[in-house]
């Protein structure tokens, strides 16, 4: 086992002349290596690939191998986003003081000004994105890590005030290590100053769009970076308030790799969308178009309760009367309809959104806790008209249903919906809701996060939103989970959809202690579109092609679209006070009771 352990090692000795000769050969080899100019190649921090610098620039400074987004300077970012020759820089001549007389600060600023050719850590100005004018700010992390001192705070505030004065949207690209320590309390106060300016911008009804880039941290995160109407982010960007190492030291735990990254914030409800840098220009352009305040004058006339079959678009089915549709709908039993709308073949909210609207862009998150995938929502065009679209989304197989929580929204879903609806009011966009849920999500977590409060806030908020709202039950309309999206000026149901206080199974279980009597429960609950129109709970029934929307989803979409166009055209002509009064009276009038007169009451006593 120990054989040879203490055996003497044999060495080869070289005379001094030979050593000198070998060193000379090594030096010659080094001098013969090809010289590579500085800046010719770049190394990816993520996958360690070596990339030709010119190729990297052509690819928007995105690694060809792994998609890693390199950090870029403010001027480079502006050049990537705006139309050529449209940039007009604002406030070029504001430069930093040294308010605390901090040793070496002024010299450091001077040095960085020469090195970066920037005067401060942000550029602001006016520019066009695909022809659309905006105020744009871009931070540069090369300049004192993009930290916010008096100059950065002032330039951000002036940019926002320019947006207010010129009636323009404001777009801010953030890249910052946070507050500028060398300016002390002056730096801290910039957080309040910039946030107050954004409040004034929002009062004016102008869009504020933020793009979070790597890194966005500290005081910038805790002020103007997280106050956007729409918050976008580049992939894998570091975004957070406290540093990861500080948190780990405090809680004595190792945090996951994805912690404080863009995708982490998307999952937790604080980012609307993560967008590849190559797509950023067109996405921003699209969002700006969706926020134009002037509505298009051209609106197509809707053809009420008629449809074009996608199988034979040249043949238009004759419009049927309300009574014909009502009688046709009675051919199936209530529980037959329950089973029909639960079919995995039934068109979902996203199916209708894709068929009816143009340019739908989905936004995520409740800005409090998470994004709920059982509710989808965002902006789109309806025949050129910007609208807010929200839908409860089920899955078609087990995996998708698990991802969508079986179409049963949690509090985050309802809070996301109300956030999008409040934005619709701010920017004067009609709201269209697609309802399809067996009910709100129930569970320990949902209750801990306030499911009841979330639904209540939706009902409260929707009752007074100053824009038209149309809600359409396309499948199941289950209890408060459905009602949370149906406080609307018009409530419609597809011919075979159902809308109820609880599922038939739940009704039978509660009242008869036997969930197997669901069919009998459905018969007495008055849950069909035909029942609810007779009870004056809903406003309209939309005929399903071939008496089943799943047989021709495209035709069903055309019916919905025609009705939406016609109704929105009518609703948009109403004065706001009239719209709100009629919405209030609509729900105020619902209820059945007997009220005895004072005389009857005294006799009974």
UniProtKB/Swiss-Prot annotation:
Taxonomy of the source species: Bacteria, Bacillati, Bacillota, Clostridia, Natranaerobiales
Function: Component of the acetyl coenzyme A carboxylase (ACC) complex. Biotin carboxylase (BC) catalyzes the carboxylation of biotin on its carrier protein (BCCP) and then the CO(2) group is transferred by the transcarboxylase to acetyl-CoA to form malonyl-CoA.
Name of the molecule in the record: Acetyl-coenzyme A carboxylase carboxyl transferase subunits beta/alpha
GO cellular component: acetyl-CoA carboxylase complex
Reactions listed under catalytic activity: N(6)-carboxybiotinyl-L-lysyl-[protein] + acetyl-CoA = N(6)-biotinyl-L-lysyl-[protein] + malonyl-CoA
Residue span, CoA carboxyltransferase C-terminal domain: 317-570
Family according to the record: In the N-terminal section; belongs to the AccD/PCCB family.
Residue ranges, annotated region (Acetyl-coenzyme A carboxylase carboxyl transferase subunit alpha): 270-593
InterPro entries: Acetyl_CoA_COase_a_su, Acetyl_CoA_COase_Trfase_b_su, ClpP/crotonase-like_dom_sf, COA_CT_C, COA_CT_N, Znf-ACC
Pathway: Lipid metabolism; malonyl-CoA biosynthesis; malonyl-CoA from acetyl-CoA: step 1/1
Organism annotation: Natranaerobius thermophilus (strain ATCC BAA-1301 / DSM 18059 / JW/NM-WN-LF)
């Amino acid at each position: 086992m120990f054989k040879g352990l203490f055996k003497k090692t044999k060495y080869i000795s070289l005379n001094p002349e030979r050593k000198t000769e070998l060193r000379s050969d090594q030096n010659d080899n080094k001098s013969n290596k090809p010289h590579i100019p500085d800046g010719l190649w770049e190394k990816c921090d993520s996958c360690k690939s070596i990339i030709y610098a010119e190729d990297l620039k052509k690819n928007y400074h995105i690694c060809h191998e792994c998609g890693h987004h390199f950090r870029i300077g403010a001027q480079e970012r502006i050049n990537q986003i705006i139309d050529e020759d449209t940039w007009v820089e604002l406030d070029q001549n504001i430069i930093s003081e040294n308010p605390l007389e901090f040793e070496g600060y002024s010299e450091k600023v001077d040095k960085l000004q020469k090195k970066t050719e920037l005067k401060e850590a942000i550029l602001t100005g006016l520019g066009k994105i695909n022809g659309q004018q905006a105020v744009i700010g871009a931070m540069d992390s090369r300049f004192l890590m993009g930290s916010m001192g008096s100059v950065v705070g002032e330039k951000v505030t002036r940019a926002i005030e320019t947006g207010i004065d010129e009636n323009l949207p404001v777009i801010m690209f953030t890249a910052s290590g946070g507050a500028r320590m060398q300016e002390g309390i002056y730096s801290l106060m910039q957080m309040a100053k910039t946030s107050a300016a954004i409040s004034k911008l929002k009062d004016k009804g102008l869009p504020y769009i933020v793009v979070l880039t790597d890194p966005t941290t500290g005081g910038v995160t805790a002020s103007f970076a997280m106050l956007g109407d729409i918050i976008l982010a580049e992939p894998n960007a570091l975004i957070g308030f406290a540093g990861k190492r500080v948190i780990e030291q405090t809680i004595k735990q190792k945090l996951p790799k994805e912690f404080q990254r863009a995708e982490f914030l998307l999952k937790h409800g604080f980012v609307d969308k993560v967008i590849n840098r190559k797509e950023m220009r067109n996405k921003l352009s699209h969002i700006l178009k969706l926020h134009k305040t002037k509505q298009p004058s051209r609106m197509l006339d809707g053809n009420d309760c008629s449809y074009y079959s996608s199988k034979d678009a040249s043949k238009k089915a004759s419009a049927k009367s309300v009574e014909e549709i009502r009688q046709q709908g009675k051919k199936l039993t209530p529980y037959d309809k329950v089973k029909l709308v639960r079919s995995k073949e039934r068109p979902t909210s996203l199916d209708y959104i894709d068929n009816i609207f143009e340019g739908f862009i989905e936004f995520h998150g409740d800005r409090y806790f998470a994004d709920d995938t059982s509710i989808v929502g965002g902006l789109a065009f309806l025949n050129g008209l910007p609208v807010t679209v929200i839908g409860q989304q089920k899955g078609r197989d087990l995996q998708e249903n698990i991802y969508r929580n079986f179409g049963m929204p949690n509090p985050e879903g309802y809070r996301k919906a109300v956030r999008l609806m409040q934005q619709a009011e701010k920017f004067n966009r009609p709201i269209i809701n697609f309802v399809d849920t067996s009910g709100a999500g129930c569970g320990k977590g949902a209750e801990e996060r306030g499911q009841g409060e979330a639904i209540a806030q939706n009902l409260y908020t929707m009752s007074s939103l100053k824009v038209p709202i149309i809600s359409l039950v396309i499948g199941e309309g289950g209890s408060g989970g459905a009602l949370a999206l149906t406080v609307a000026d018009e409530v419609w149901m597809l011919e075979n959809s159902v809308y109820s206080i609880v599922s038939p199974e739940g009704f039978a279980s509660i009242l008869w202690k036997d969930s197997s009597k669901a069919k009998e429960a459905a018969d007495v609950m008055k849950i069909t579109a035909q029942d609810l129109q007779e009870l004056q709970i809903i406003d309209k029934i939309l005929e399903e092609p071939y008496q089943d929307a799943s047989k021709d989803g495209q035709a069903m979409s055309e019916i919905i679209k025609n009705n939406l166009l016609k109704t929105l055209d009518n609703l948009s002509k109403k004065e706001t006070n009239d719209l709100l009064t009629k919405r209030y009276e609509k729900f105020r009038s619902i209820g059945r009771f007997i009220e005895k007169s004072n005389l009857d009451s005294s006799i009974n006593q």
